[in-house]
Amino acid sequence: MLSLKNAARNGLASRFDCICADVLDIRSVTTHGSFDCVFTNPPYLKNNCGFRNADPGKFAAFHETTAGIDGFVAAAAHLLKNGGRFCAVYRPEYLSKLLFSMESRDIRPKRLRIVYPSQDKPPCLVLAEGKKAAKDGMITEKPFYIYSDNTHKHFSSGMNAVYERFSCGSSRLVNNND
């Protein structure tokens, strides 16, 4: 599994568990309320949208082939303890759908950050964090820029800080895209 391989290469394998299961069948493989944090980067394109990759795995990674955001949030709500954190990477054009789904599953949005490739480009991602069975109140973080300019050759100081923070002593993180 790619996530476990990357975690091991970056010295993080002991810090999390990874479940390989159908999100719609999560109740059969886990116990309700057994996780402190659930992180998801779910598929966000409708089946009839965008480039249709011939590789079924790659197609499923980007397209809602079996479950939409509501299925992923429902799975997270099942997995999380009260007070547990839900973290999602999603597309900005579907932000309202994500927030509505979180609220409807008793996961209160707590932090939101919009990610831009650079200052002259429209947003490409949203990072949302919620807390199960929490009180209302959300912080909107300042925008995050991946690149320092529109050439997209140099990371921003914020992106460099992310690499430094999570490098665990290595000079840079390893991303195994095999």
Predicted feature residues:
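Short, glycine/acidic-enriched loop or turn micro-motifs at the edges of active sites
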Residues: 25, 44, 132
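SAM/dcSAM-binding transferase cores
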Residues: 123-178
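Class I S-adenosyl-L-methionine
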Residues: 1-4, 8, 45, 99, ...
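Mobile active-site "lid"/loop adjacent to the S-adenosyl-L-methionine
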Residues: 33, 37, 42-71
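Short glycine-/acidic-enriched loop or helix-start segments at secondary-structure transitions
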Residues: 28, 49-50, 98-99
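S-adenosyl-L-methionine
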Residues: 2-36
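Conserved Class I SAM-dependent methyltransferase catalytic core
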Residues: 65-123, 127-128
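Conserved beta-strand termini and adjacent loop/short-helix elements that scaffold enzyme active sites
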Residues: 21, 112-115, 149
